[in-house]
Amino acid sequence: MNRRVRPQYDDSDESGVEYESGHDEMEEISFGALNSAQKKIKNEDEKKWSRRNNSNNDSDGEEGDFFESDSDGPPEESSSKTSDQKTRSKHAPAEASAKRPVSRIRQIPGLETKDNSKFGDIRFDPAFGKANEERIRKDYSFLNEYRQSELEQMQRMLKDKKLSRSMSPRERQELELQTQSLRSRLDSMKNKDLEAQVLAEHKKQQKEKWKSGQQAAPYFLKKSEKRKLLQKAKFESMKAPQREKVMERKRKRRLGKEMRQLEFGRK
């Protein structure tokens, strides 16, 4: 009988064939495909690593909360805050932050202050007593000189024809109003000074008469007498043209009053 003999192959030959076939397959793969495969593998590794870290942190936090439940740490504060929020009723009073700027004006309970006196000058505050107007006018008398010089300057500007041509009608009107306002302010201040001077002289005369024995007691003027005395002093201090204007005004007023009385009598 004839026996068939199977051919024998070495393992080295098989491995060599497999290596050659695998090497041929790697050569056929493009560089872009290899690069994308590497990126994909890298992303998967990073995701796995982050999952492991998160699981470790969660386990550590649970263990820390378990072992540090008695300590005053941030976890306990957060849990207390959440519990307060859960237990707080909707009818509870609103909470406001205490970190607010301090007011410059101190609020005193029971003390009422006017809005216009909050930012006033403390020298004229009624809490320090009544203001001495005579002393104030004496201390700030130099301001009248500045006002007078300013009034003269504005009057020169209005009289200057060249300057008035360069100004617009609106600017000229504003300058005239400012001049009129400043003039009336100076006149009112002069009248106040004159009134204070007249009353001070009358008070001085009454005091001297009382000391010399001419009067048993000083005489205090009534409001009507004071008004007449002040009108007389103002009329005497006026110049001739001003006196004529005042007399003309009084004459017209008296004439109008008489005409109204006649018309009323005819009816």
UniProtKB/Swiss-Prot annotation:
Comp. bias (Acidic residues): 59-75
Listed under GO cellular component are:
90S preribosome; nucleolus; small-subunit processome
Against InterPro entries, the record matches this protein to:
RRP36
Per UniProt, the keywords (alphabetical) are: Coiled coil, Nucleus, Ribonucleoprotein, Ribosome biogenesis, rRNA processing
Compartmental location: Nucleus, Nucleolus
One matching Pfam family, short form? RRP36
Q: Which GO terms describe its biological process?
A: maturation of SSU-rRNA from tricistronic rRNA transcript (SSU-rRNA, 5.8S rRNA, LSU-rRNA)
- What segment(s) does the record annotate as region Disordered? 1-125, 160-188, 201-267
Specify residue ranges for compositional bias: Basic and acidic residues: 112-124, 160-175, 201-211, 233-247, 256-267
Domain of life the protein comes from: Eukaryota
Q: Which residues form a coiled coil?
A: 170-193, 242-263
Q: What role is this protein assigned? A: Component of the 90S pre-ribosome involved in the maturation of rRNAs. Required for early cleavages of the pre-RNAs in the 40S ribosomal subunit maturation pathway.
Q: Which family does it belong to?
A: Belongs to the RRP36 family.
Q: How does it assemble?
A: Associates with 90S and pre-40S pre-ribosomal particles.
Q: What protein does this entry describe?
A: rRNA biogenesis protein RRP36
Organism name? Meyerozyma guilliermondii (strain ATCC 6260 / CBS 566 / DSM 6381 / JCM 1539 / NBRC 10279 / NRRL Y-324) (Yeast)
